[in-house]
């Protein structure tokens, strides 16, 4: 089992990062979008990983904090929740926000995640009750020192396409992704668009308000 990968971030294509280890092996890892946005091209990174084996592929999912990985593993144990849906949940909510949704039985909030309807949300509330009690409400799930994000894409069109592609890969509909991107770009910060990660962060905030 591959539990932790440390290496240089040699490629970023939301929501997948490729880390080149000291042994010369490059690992492709899919991350929740908030974690992806913390990575910097050519910088060193450490990711806690979960290996997901399918008949046709072996996929690595990565997280900046081991508690996030624990949350992911709890999510995929729920009947009807696969790795893609779990990743979409962790791209929509932080671990502490997910805990709050479960503790307060807020199924309406959970239905904001692509692919989660009323029945699935209620199943999540039942099967996850008490599973996140080890998560403290004031806990930070990011690394101790967050890296500055400053990765310039080739053009504005490339940035927009990458952000939309990342959202669609998580299950958001084309129109929903485009509306969120449009709303993000209309903010003061969005008008100073410089890179894919920054726009992803803004767009995720907009989606949480929809």
From Swiss-Prot:
HAMAP family: DNA_HJ_migration_RuvA. Its main location: cytoplasm. Residues 155-210 are annotated as: Domain III. It comes from the Bacteria. Residues 65-143 are annotated as: Domain II. It is found in: Cytoplasm. Homotetramer. Forms an RuvA(8)-RuvB(12)-Holliday junction (HJ) complex. HJ DNA is sandwiched between 2 RuvA tetramers; dsDNA enters through RuvA and exits via RuvB. An RuvB hexamer assembles on each DNA strand where it exits the tetramer. Each RuvB hexamer is contacted by two RuvA subunits (via domain III) on 2 adjacent RuvB subunits; this complex drives branch migration. In the full resolvosome a probable DNA-RuvA(4)-RuvB(12)-RuvC(2) complex forms which resolves the HJ. Belongs to the RuvA family. The lineage of its organism: Bacteria, Pseudomonadati, Pseudomonadota, Gammaproteobacteria, Moraxellales. The gene is ruvA. The RuvA-RuvB-RuvC complex processes Holliday junction (HJ) DNA during genetic recombination and DNA repair, while the RuvA-RuvB complex plays an important role in the rescue of blocked DNA replication forks via replication fork reversal (RFR). RuvA specifically binds to HJ cruciform DNA, conferring on it an open structure. The RuvB hexamer acts as an ATP-dependent pump, pulling dsDNA into and through the RuvAB complex. HJ branch migration allows RuvC to scan DNA until it finds its consensus sequence, where it cleaves and resolves the cruciform DNA. The keyword DNA damage applies. The keyword DNA repair applies. Keywords: Cytoplasm, DNA damage, DNA recombination, DNA repair, DNA-binding. Residues 1-64 are annotated as: Domain I. This is Holliday junction branch migration complex subunit RuvA. Has three domains with a flexible linker between the domains II and III and assumes an 'L' shape. Domain III is highly mobile and contacts RuvB. GO terms for molecular function: ATP binding; four-way junction DNA binding; four-way junction helicase activity.
